[in-house]
């Protein structure tokens, strides 16, 4: 099977919530010599983007999101050990990534993938999980004031995305904004939104998120 055919089948497995098929294809891709990064960026991530766009357009609903998440998990169980083998040791002081999904949002497909990719690129990780209060993010950032920190938040829904603006406002109120970098992602998040709320960056996918995070933490 040609690489592109495998990538297309992986994308389709995410979109159709084919959990067993996604795991099988992931292993086949590895066996064919395809790198874990290519499997993620060219096969799995496009499927996640389609799912996110469909959810934003109300073409699918939470149960389908959860099943696609399980398909992604089945792939990541296979890929994470492979990513660990090729883990990039970060330069001294690469920093701590505090990752979280916005309050009111329980999807974690992209969140888990971004967290994995950040860890594979040398970041220390503090994963706060899903449905995280802005207050919790503020508390964790305040505890570590003076360290190199990047906040990496995810939101799949427009309603939960709005909390990102509140978080940025709170960071400024608490005099924490200058001590952290802020990157947000998710289907509704755009460059325009990032500029509007005064954050530092967004990214199209998990691999790009890791590159962007490394760049803005230099």
UniProtKB/Swiss-Prot annotation:
Domain of life: Archaea
Domain B12-binding: 94-218
Any one cellular-component term (Gene Ontology): cytosol
Gene Ontology biological-process annotations: homocysteine metabolic process; methanogenesis; tetrahydrofolate metabolic process
Record note on quaternary structure: Can form a complex with MtmB.
Family: Belongs to the methylamine corrinoid protein family.
Name assigned to this protein: Monomethylamine corrinoid protein 1
Record organism: Methanosarcina mazei (strain ATCC BAA-159 / DSM 3647 / Goe1 / Go1 / JCM 11833 / OCM 88)
Gene that encodes the chain: mtmC1
């Amino acid at each position: 099977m040609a690489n592109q055919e495998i990538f297309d089948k992986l994308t389709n497995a995410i979109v159709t919530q084919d959990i067993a098929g996604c795991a099988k294809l992931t292993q086949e891709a590895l066996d064919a010599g395809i790198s874990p990064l290519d499997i993620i960026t060219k096969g799995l991530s496009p499927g996640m983007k389609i799912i996110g766009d469909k959810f934003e357009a109300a073409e699918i609903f939470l149960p389908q999101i959860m099943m696609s998440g399980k398909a992604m998990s089945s792939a990541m169980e296979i890929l994470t050990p492979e990513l660990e083998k090729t883990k990039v040791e970060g330069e001294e002081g690469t920093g701590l990534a505090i990752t979280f999904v916005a309050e009111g949002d329980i999807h974690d497909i992209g969140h888990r993938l971004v967290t994995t990719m950040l860890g594979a690129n040398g970041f220390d990780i503090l994963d706060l999980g899903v449905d995280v209060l802005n207050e919790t993010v503020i508390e964790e950032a305040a505890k570590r004031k003076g360290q190199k920190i990047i906040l990496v938040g995810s939101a799949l829904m427009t309603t939960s995305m709005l909390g990102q603006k509140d978080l940025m406002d709170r960071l400024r109120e608490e005099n924490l904004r200058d001590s952290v970098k802020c990157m947000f992602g998710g289907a509704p998040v755009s460059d325009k939104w990032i500029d509007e709320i005064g954050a530092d960056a967004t990214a199209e996918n998990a691999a790009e998120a890791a590159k962007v995070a490394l760049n803005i933490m230099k």
